[in-house]
Amino acid sequence: MTTTPNAATARRGSEWLDSWDPEDESTWDKRLAWQTLWITTFTLTMCFVAWFLPSAIIPKLNAIGYSFSKPQLYWLAATPGLAAGLLRLVWMVLPPIMGTRKMVALTTLLLVFPVLGWGVRTMVPNAPYWELLVLAFLAGIGGGAFSGFMPSTSYFFPKRMAGTALGLQAGIGNFGVSLVQLITPWIIGFGMFWWMGISQQMKFPGKADQQVWYQAASFVWLPFILIGAFLAWRYLKSVPIKANIRQQFDIFSNQDTWWMTILYIMTFGTFSGLSAQFGLLMINLYGAGNAAIVQGSGASAQLLVQGYDVPDPVKYVFLGPLIGAGARVLFAPLTDRTGGAIWTLISGVGLVGSIWWTIGGLTPDTSSAEALAAGFDRFLYGMLLIFLFSGIGNASTFKQMPMIFEKRQAGGVIGWTAAIAAFGPFLFGIGITVMGVVPFYVVGIVWAVMCVVITWVRYARPGAPKKS
């Protein structure tokens, strides 16, 4: 992708580069490209923190004083995904219009609103349901940003490094999911955060109430968000791309846009959907949400399965996103060497097998504590395998797109596919609520099989039309 002064006629100011050609090794500014990558990766991590902050809070809302039904909680956890999918359709067209600097800095500042709001509304747990829905929707800003940040970063790197650069940014950014889910249970119990506001009493089945400061799970991120916005405004540059909104929509006449969208729904749709619902699934299948296991709440709750140790979801939910994000980072360099299609194929086959295995753990056997514990282990390890293979696919599909499409279109396709896959938390939440857990997972197997066929026929087999 080459830009010329004519492409930047209307671009004035020190933030805009006069020309930029990452494919020309003699003029490519490697230092600027990597500086852009690391700053935007840090801010993208904060975006994922804000996006999945509700998923770390929602499973414990009833324990700190709210009284929502299971469907209400699933809808609440699904809403950030709905918002992210819709907002990604907006953010995908912003990079050529706003430029990297303004888009990244201003987007990062917007994260203050949902993060601050969730902190306030967990500090005093008396907000109406609609208000929490609004906050959940605003959290989707963090998810929407992905479709602007990733194409913008792709402008700075040559095609031969696209898999590594985008894999690092997306993978490290995805760590924001496990980061917020890991730190939340650890930070809320610290008395040192008394200055952040009043405490709450968290109820545990059959145990004494625990004093917590749940607002700390939100407030602790605000300084990092502000630092990210400052770094973006101070150090980022913008590549002048000659493409208006109408030009960007020419990607929809290319059939590979639609095939890659289907594949990315399998990979990132699964990663984001399960990241949002993992905690609730664990509670409702093997925890206090299952009336066949626990009756009542708090210290007076009655455990109906003698000897069963009810798992605390906050000890496990971060593992899935951590494994998925780690796989994305580790496999990105491999895709630069081998191409992405073969790994997308492996991802699809792996998802078929791991989803099938997990289905056996979706119907808890409450006949004994041993049977329940065995079912929980199968559920947990199956879910972690699903995260692993979705992470591999996230890396490989992002290698394929820059190989299949020319530079300007590749950015648009990355934004579009990311937008649709971001509906994962919404679709998973609604699908589980409407269909039930087991039928929804069966649909997941069917989808993965379809993706394996598409990948082999179109991208991976010898003589494939778009070998990638």
Annotated model-derived regions:
Residues 1-49:
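Cytosolic juxtamembrane N-terminal segment immediately preceding the first transmembrane helix
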Residues 54-59, 181, 254-326:
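Extracytoplasmic gate region of multi-pass secondary transporters
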Residues 75-93, 318-331:
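Central cavity-lining transmembrane alpha-helices of secondary-active solute carriers
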Residues 96-108, 336-350:
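Cytoplasmic membrane-interface "Motif A"-like loop-to-helix N-cap segments
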Residues 143, 163-192, 415-428:
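Glycine-rich segments within core transmembrane alpha-helices of 12-TM secondary carriers
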Residues 144-158, 391-406:
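Intracellular juxtamembrane helix-capping segments at the cytosolic ends
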Residues 189, 220-242, 451-459:
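C-terminal membrane-cytosol helix-exit motif in multi-pass small-molecule transporters
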Residues 312, 318-321, 338-396:
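C-terminal transmembrane helical hairpin of 12-TM major facilitator-type secondary transporters
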